[in-house]
Protein backbone atom coordinates (compact mmCIF):
# COMPACT_ATOMS: atom_id res chain seq x y z
CA UNK A 1 0.00 0.00 0.00
CA UNK A 2 1.45 3.35 -1.00
CA UNK A 3 1.40 5.94 1.78
CA UNK A 4 2.20 9.61 1.42
CA UNK A 5 2.17 12.80 3.47
CA UNK A 6 4.83 11.84 6.01
CA UNK A 7 5.70 14.94 8.03
CA UNK A 8 7.61 15.87 11.16
CA UNK A 9 4.37 15.21 13.06
CA UNK A 10 3.98 11.69 11.68
CA UNK A 11 4.13 9.09 14.41
CA UNK A 12 5.15 6.16 12.18
CA UNK A 13 7.84 5.91 9.52
CA UNK A 14 7.12 4.84 5.97
CA UNK A 15 8.58 1.37 6.64
CA UNK A 16 6.53 0.66 9.78
CA UNK A 17 5.42 -2.97 9.91
CA UNK A 18 2.77 -3.85 12.51
CA UNK A 19 3.64 -6.59 14.98
CA UNK A 20 2.47 -8.32 18.16
CA UNK A 21 4.23 -8.26 21.54
CA UNK A 22 3.33 -11.57 23.23
CA UNK A 23 2.61 -12.26 26.90
CA UNK A 24 2.16 -16.04 26.98
CA UNK A 25 1.09 -18.24 29.87
CA UNK A 26 3.48 -21.01 30.85
CA UNK A 27 1.00 -23.88 30.51
CA UNK A 28 -0.65 -23.64 27.11
CA UNK A 29 -2.95 -26.54 27.91
CA UNK A 30 -4.49 -24.35 30.61
CA UNK A 31 -4.72 -21.15 28.53
CA UNK A 32 -8.19 -19.62 28.88
CA UNK A 33 -7.99 -17.81 25.57
CA UNK A 34 -6.04 -15.33 23.48
CA UNK A 35 -6.46 -11.60 24.12
CA UNK A 36 -5.25 -8.99 21.62
CA UNK A 37 -4.74 -5.61 23.30
CA UNK A 38 -4.83 -2.35 21.32
CA UNK A 39 -3.82 0.84 23.10
CA UNK A 40 -5.49 4.15 22.37
CA UNK A 41 -4.14 7.39 21.01
CA UNK A 42 -6.72 7.99 18.34
CA UNK A 43 -5.37 6.89 15.00
CA UNK A 44 -2.25 9.00 15.50
CA UNK A 45 -0.31 7.38 18.38
CA UNK A 46 -0.04 4.29 20.60
CA UNK A 47 -0.46 4.75 24.35
CA UNK A 48 1.12 1.41 25.21
CA UNK A 49 2.55 2.48 28.57
CA UNK A 50 -0.94 2.91 30.06
CA UNK A 51 -3.30 0.99 27.78
CA UNK A 52 -1.11 -1.71 26.26
CA UNK A 53 1.49 -3.50 28.32
CA UNK A 54 -0.25 -3.29 31.76
CA UNK A 55 -3.47 -4.64 30.25
CA UNK A 56 -1.66 -7.55 28.59
CA UNK A 57 0.09 -8.40 31.85
CA UNK A 58 -3.23 -8.35 33.74
CA UNK A 59 -4.91 -10.72 31.29
CA UNK A 60 -1.83 -12.96 31.31
CA UNK A 61 -2.11 -13.16 35.11
CA UNK A 62 -5.72 -14.30 34.64
CA UNK A 63 -4.63 -17.17 32.38
CA UNK A 64 -4.83 -15.68 28.88
CA UNK A 65 -2.21 -15.47 26.19
CA UNK A 66 -2.10 -11.73 25.58
CA UNK A 67 -0.61 -9.76 22.71
CA UNK A 68 -0.12 -6.01 22.40
CA UNK A 69 -0.83 -5.06 18.80
CA UNK A 70 1.52 -2.41 17.49
CA UNK A 71 -0.87 -1.09 14.87
CA UNK A 72 0.06 1.46 12.25
CA UNK A 73 -0.93 5.02 13.10
CA UNK A 74 -0.62 8.44 11.43
CA UNK A 75 -0.12 9.10 8.65
CA UNK A 76 -1.59 5.68 7.93
CA UNK A 77 -5.38 5.65 7.65
CA UNK A 78 -7.95 4.19 10.02
CA UNK A 79 -8.61 1.50 7.42
CA UNK A 80 -4.94 0.50 7.70
CA UNK A 81 -5.34 -0.03 11.44
CA UNK A 82 -8.43 -2.16 10.82
CA UNK A 83 -6.38 -4.25 8.40
CA UNK A 84 -3.70 -4.67 11.08
CA UNK A 85 -6.36 -5.94 13.47
CA UNK A 86 -7.69 -8.38 10.89
CA UNK A 87 -4.20 -9.70 10.19
CA UNK A 88 -3.49 -10.18 13.90
CA UNK A 89 -6.57 -12.39 14.34
CA UNK A 90 -5.74 -14.43 11.27
CA UNK A 91 -2.06 -14.69 12.23
CA UNK A 92 -2.95 -16.30 15.56
CA UNK A 93 -5.32 -18.79 13.95
CA UNK A 94 -2.88 -19.69 11.19
CA UNK A 95 0.13 -20.12 13.48
CA UNK A 96 -1.58 -21.61 16.54
CA UNK A 97 -0.25 -25.13 15.95
CA UNK A 98 3.29 -24.13 14.99
CA UNK A 99 3.54 -21.79 17.97
CA UNK A 100 1.90 -24.27 20.32
CA UNK A 101 -0.81 -21.84 21.40
CA UNK A 102 -3.63 -23.04 23.62
CA UNK A 103 -7.03 -21.51 24.24
CA UNK A 104 -7.75 -21.08 20.55
CA UNK A 105 -11.47 -21.58 21.06
CA UNK A 106 -11.49 -17.97 22.28
CA UNK A 107 -9.85 -15.09 20.42
CA UNK A 108 -10.76 -11.83 22.09
CA UNK A 109 -9.66 -8.20 21.88
CA UNK A 110 -9.56 -5.26 24.28
CA UNK A 111 -9.12 -1.75 22.92
CA UNK A 112 -9.10 1.77 24.30
CA UNK A 113 -10.35 4.91 22.55
CA UNK A 114 -8.70 4.65 19.11
CA UNK A 115 -7.82 1.05 19.94
CA UNK A 116 -11.51 0.44 20.52
CA UNK A 117 -12.17 1.96 17.11
CA UNK A 118 -9.58 -0.37 15.60
CA UNK A 119 -11.48 -3.39 16.94
CA UNK A 120 -14.92 -2.16 15.92
CA UNK A 121 -13.74 -1.15 12.45
CA UNK A 122 -12.48 -4.69 11.92
CA UNK A 123 -15.66 -6.24 13.31
CA UNK A 124 -17.85 -4.04 11.12
CA UNK A 125 -15.90 -4.29 7.87
CA UNK A 126 -13.17 -6.95 7.83
CA UNK A 127 -14.84 -9.93 9.47
CA UNK A 128 -14.96 -13.59 8.49
CA UNK A 129 -13.54 -14.23 5.04
CA UNK A 130 -13.52 -10.59 3.85
CA UNK A 131 -10.22 -9.92 2.11
CA UNK A 132 -7.91 -6.90 2.59
CA UNK A 133 -8.52 -5.97 -1.04
CA UNK A 134 -11.67 -4.28 0.25
CA UNK A 135 -9.41 -1.35 1.14
CA UNK A 136 -6.19 -2.14 -0.76
CA UNK A 137 -6.75 -3.18 -4.37
CA UNK A 138 -3.06 -4.09 -4.76
CA UNK A 139 -2.97 -6.41 -1.76
CA UNK A 140 -1.76 -9.95 -2.55
CA UNK A 141 -3.61 -12.41 -0.32
CA UNK A 142 -1.70 -15.35 1.16
CA UNK A 143 -2.47 -18.47 3.18
CA UNK A 144 -2.95 -16.45 6.37
CA UNK A 145 -5.74 -14.51 4.69
CA UNK A 146 -7.72 -17.71 4.22
CA UNK A 147 -8.31 -17.91 7.97
CA UNK A 148 -11.42 -16.42 9.57
CA UNK A 149 -11.03 -12.92 10.97
CA UNK A 150 -13.97 -13.32 13.36
CA UNK A 151 -13.46 -12.49 17.03
CA UNK A 152 -15.29 -14.32 19.80
CA UNK A 153 -15.38 -11.52 22.39
CA UNK A 154 -14.49 -7.83 22.23
CA UNK A 155 -13.98 -5.29 25.01
CA UNK A 156 -14.17 -1.80 23.42
CA UNK A 157 -13.53 0.81 26.11
CA UNK A 158 -14.39 4.51 25.77
CA UNK A 159 -14.25 4.79 22.01
CA UNK A 160 -17.19 3.30 20.12
CA UNK A 161 -17.05 5.60 17.07
CA UNK A 162 -14.67 3.67 14.87
CA UNK A 163 -14.64 6.02 11.87
CA UNK A 164 -12.41 8.49 13.71
CA UNK A 165 -15.02 11.19 14.21
CA UNK A 166 -17.41 11.81 17.11
CA UNK A 167 -20.58 12.88 15.36
CA UNK A 168 -24.06 13.55 16.68
CA UNK A 169 -25.64 11.22 14.11
CA UNK A 170 -23.63 8.17 15.21
CA UNK A 171 -25.78 5.09 14.54
CA UNK A 172 -23.72 2.42 16.28
CA UNK A 173 -22.33 -0.68 14.61
CA UNK A 174 -23.41 -0.68 10.98
CA UNK A 175 -22.42 -4.02 9.50
CA UNK A 176 -23.53 -7.13 7.64
CA UNK A 177 -21.32 -9.29 9.87
CA UNK A 178 -23.44 -12.39 10.65
CA UNK A 179 -21.16 -13.48 13.52
CA UNK A 180 -20.87 -10.50 15.82
CA UNK A 181 -18.65 -11.16 18.84
CA UNK A 182 -19.96 -10.85 22.38
CA UNK A 183 -19.39 -7.28 23.61
CA UNK A 184 -18.19 -6.03 27.00
CA UNK A 185 -18.43 -2.23 26.91
CA UNK A 186 -17.12 0.22 29.50
CA UNK A 187 -16.82 4.00 29.81
CA UNK A 188 -16.35 6.68 32.46
CA UNK A 189 -19.38 8.84 33.25
CA UNK A 190 -17.23 11.99 33.03
CA UNK A 191 -15.79 11.16 29.59
CA UNK A 192 -15.88 14.43 27.68
CA UNK A 193 -15.13 12.96 24.25
CA UNK A 194 -18.69 11.82 23.55
CA UNK A 195 -17.95 8.19 24.37
CA UNK A 196 -20.52 8.13 27.18
CA UNK A 197 -23.67 8.58 25.04
CA UNK A 198 -22.08 6.77 22.10
CA UNK A 199 -21.54 3.58 24.05
CA UNK A 200 -25.29 3.20 24.58
CA UNK A 201 -25.89 3.74 20.87
CA UNK A 202 -23.34 1.03 20.14
CA UNK A 203 -24.89 -1.33 22.68
CA UNK A 204 -28.41 -0.84 21.36
CA UNK A 205 -27.27 -1.41 17.77
CA UNK A 206 -25.83 -4.81 18.74
CA UNK A 207 -28.53 -6.05 21.11
CA UNK A 208 -30.50 -8.97 19.73
CA UNK A 209 -27.54 -9.92 17.54
CA UNK A 210 -25.06 -10.85 20.27
CA UNK A 211 -24.57 -10.73 24.03
CA UNK A 212 -23.89 -7.16 25.21
CA UNK A 213 -22.85 -5.95 28.66
CA UNK A 214 -22.31 -2.26 29.50
CA UNK A 215 -20.52 -0.69 32.48
CA UNK A 216 -20.32 3.00 33.31
CA UNK A 217 -17.99 4.17 36.08
CA UNK A 218 -18.72 7.15 38.33
CA UNK A 219 -16.12 9.91 38.77
CA UNK A 220 -14.07 8.57 35.85
CA UNK A 221 -13.16 10.39 32.67
CA UNK A 222 -11.48 9.38 29.43
CA UNK A 223 -8.41 7.17 29.37
CA UNK A 224 -8.57 5.12 32.57
CA UNK A 225 -6.61 2.16 31.20
CA UNK A 226 -6.45 -0.65 33.76
CA UNK A 227 -8.55 1.48 36.10
CA UNK A 228 -8.42 4.73 38.05
CA UNK A 229 -7.45 4.11 41.66
CA UNK A 230 -10.19 4.92 44.13
CA UNK A 231 -12.97 4.13 41.62
CA UNK A 232 -14.78 0.98 40.59
CA UNK A 233 -13.12 1.17 37.17
CA UNK A 234 -10.26 -0.85 38.70
CA UNK A 235 -12.58 -3.87 38.54
CA UNK A 236 -13.21 -3.84 34.81
CA UNK A 237 -10.56 -6.46 33.91
CA UNK A 238 -11.80 -9.14 36.35
CA UNK A 239 -15.37 -8.30 35.30
CA UNK A 240 -14.38 -8.76 31.65
CA UNK A 241 -12.81 -12.10 32.58
CA UNK A 242 -16.08 -13.20 34.20
CA UNK A 243 -18.00 -12.02 31.13
CA UNK A 244 -15.75 -14.07 28.86
CA UNK A 245 -16.30 -17.11 31.06
CA UNK A 246 -20.04 -16.51 30.78
CA UNK A 247 -20.23 -16.27 27.01
CA UNK A 248 -17.72 -19.08 26.47
CA UNK A 249 -19.83 -21.30 28.74
CA UNK A 250 -17.23 -22.17 31.33
CA UNK A 251 -17.97 -20.08 34.41
CA UNK A 252 -20.32 -20.54 37.33
CA UNK A 253 -22.98 -18.76 35.29
CA UNK A 254 -21.95 -20.39 32.03
CA UNK A 255 -23.93 -22.69 29.80
CA UNK A 256 -23.11 -26.36 29.58
CA UNK A 257 -21.48 -26.94 32.98
CA UNK A 258 -22.54 -30.37 34.21
CA UNK A 259 -22.01 -29.20 37.80
CA UNK A 260 -24.80 -26.68 37.33
CA UNK A 261 -27.42 -29.33 36.69
CA UNK A 262 -29.32 -30.05 39.91
CA UNK A 263 -29.49 -33.52 41.41
CA UNK A 264 -32.22 -35.75 40.06
CA UNK A 265 -31.56 -34.94 36.40
CA UNK A 266 -29.83 -37.83 34.66
CA UNK A 267 -29.87 -37.03 30.92
CA UNK A 268 -28.69 -33.89 29.17
CA UNK A 269 -28.14 -32.37 25.74
CA UNK A 270 -27.11 -29.03 24.29
CA UNK A 271 -28.57 -27.36 21.22
CA UNK A 272 -29.21 -23.96 19.68
CA UNK A 273 -32.67 -22.41 19.88
CA UNK A 274 -33.80 -19.22 18.18
CA UNK A 275 -36.82 -17.42 19.56
CA UNK A 276 -38.16 -13.94 20.08
CA UNK A 277 -35.24 -13.18 22.41
CA UNK A 278 -32.68 -14.14 19.77
CA UNK A 279 -30.44 -17.18 19.41
CA UNK A 280 -29.30 -19.08 22.50
CA UNK A 281 -27.23 -22.16 23.30
CA UNK A 282 -29.46 -24.26 25.55
CA UNK A 283 -28.46 -26.88 28.09
CA UNK A 284 -31.51 -29.09 28.68
CA UNK A 285 -31.70 -31.89 31.27
CA UNK A 286 -34.41 -34.40 32.20
CA UNK A 287 -34.80 -37.34 34.56
CA UNK A 288 -34.92 -40.93 33.31
CA UNK A 289 -38.71 -41.00 33.28
CA UNK A 290 -38.93 -37.58 31.64
CA UNK A 291 -41.23 -36.26 34.33
CA UNK A 292 -39.26 -33.05 34.90
CA UNK A 293 -37.03 -30.73 32.89
CA UNK A 294 -34.29 -28.20 33.63
CA UNK A 295 -33.12 -25.67 31.01
CA UNK A 296 -30.47 -22.95 31.18
CA UNK A 297 -29.26 -20.47 28.55
CA UNK A 298 -28.36 -16.81 28.06
CA UNK A 299 -31.08 -14.40 26.92
CA UNK A 300 -31.65 -10.70 27.46
CA UNK A 301 -27.98 -10.50 28.50
CA UNK A 302 -28.49 -12.67 31.57
CA UNK A 303 -28.43 -16.31 32.51
CA UNK A 304 -31.89 -17.88 32.36
CA UNK A 305 -32.97 -20.94 34.35
CA UNK A 306 -36.32 -22.66 33.78
CA UNK A 307 -37.61 -25.79 35.51
CA UNK A 308 -40.89 -27.62 35.08
CA UNK A 309 -42.78 -30.88 35.31
CA UNK A 310 -43.44 -32.92 32.17
CA UNK A 311 -46.65 -34.76 31.29
CA UNK A 312 -46.41 -36.50 27.90
CA UNK A 313 -43.91 -33.85 26.83
CA UNK A 314 -46.06 -30.93 27.96
CA UNK A 315 -44.31 -28.55 30.38
CA UNK A 316 -45.85 -26.93 33.41
CA UNK A 317 -43.28 -24.36 34.51
CA UNK A 318 -42.51 -24.49 38.23
CA UNK A 319 -39.54 -22.08 38.27
CA UNK A 320 -38.63 -19.22 35.94
CA UNK A 321 -35.60 -17.33 37.25
CA UNK A 322 -36.21 -14.08 35.35
CA UNK A 323 -39.97 -14.39 34.94
CA UNK A 324 -39.63 -13.83 31.18
CA UNK A 325 -39.29 -17.38 29.84
CA UNK A 326 -42.48 -19.21 30.84
CA UNK A 327 -44.20 -18.58 27.52
CA UNK A 328 -41.14 -19.81 25.59
CA UNK A 329 -40.44 -22.89 27.71
CA UNK A 330 -42.46 -25.36 25.63
CA UNK A 331 -40.91 -24.28 22.34
CA UNK A 332 -37.41 -24.43 23.83
CA UNK A 333 -38.01 -27.95 25.12
CA UNK A 334 -39.59 -29.05 21.83
CA UNK A 335 -36.36 -28.10 20.05
CA UNK A 336 -34.51 -30.87 21.91
CA UNK A 337 -33.72 -34.04 19.97
CA UNK A 338 -35.50 -36.78 21.92
CA UNK A 339 -33.08 -39.34 20.47
CA UNK A 340 -29.93 -37.48 21.51
CA UNK A 341 -29.95 -37.54 25.31
CA UNK A 342 -26.58 -38.17 26.97
CA UNK A 343 -25.85 -39.21 30.57
CA UNK A 344 -25.11 -36.34 32.95
CA UNK A 345 -21.40 -36.49 33.74
Question: Where in the sequence are the language-model features?
Answer:
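C-terminal catalytic histidine-bearing segment of alpha/beta-hydrolase fold enzymes
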Residues: 200-203, 207-259
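N-terminal cap/lid segment of alpha/beta-hydrolase-fold proteins
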Residues: 1-29, 78
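Primarily recognizes the serine-hydrolase "nucleophile elbow" in alpha/beta-hydrolase
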Residues: 87-178
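Surface-exposed, glycine/proline- and aromatic-rich loop segments on solvent-exposed faces
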Residues: 262, 268-344
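Short beta-strand/loop motif that positions the catalytic acidic residue
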Residues: 184-187
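Short beta-strand element of the alpha/beta-hydrolase
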Residues: 31-41
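Catalytic nucleophile-loop/oxyanion-hole region of alpha/beta-hydrolase
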Residues: 47-49, 69-103, 229-233
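Conserved alpha/beta-hydrolase "acid-adjacent" motif
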Residues: 166, 192-198
Amino acid sequence: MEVSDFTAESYDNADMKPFLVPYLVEDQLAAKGNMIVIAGGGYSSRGNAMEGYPIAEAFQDLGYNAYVLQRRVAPYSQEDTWLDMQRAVRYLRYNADSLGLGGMDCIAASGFSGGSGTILGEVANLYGNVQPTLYDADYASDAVDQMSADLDVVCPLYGPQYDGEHTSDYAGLITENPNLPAMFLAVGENDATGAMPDIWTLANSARGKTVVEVHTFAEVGHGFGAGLQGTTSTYWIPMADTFIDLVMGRGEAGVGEAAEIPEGYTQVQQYTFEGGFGKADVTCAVDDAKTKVYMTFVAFDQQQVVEGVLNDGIITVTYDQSGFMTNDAQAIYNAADQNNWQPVA
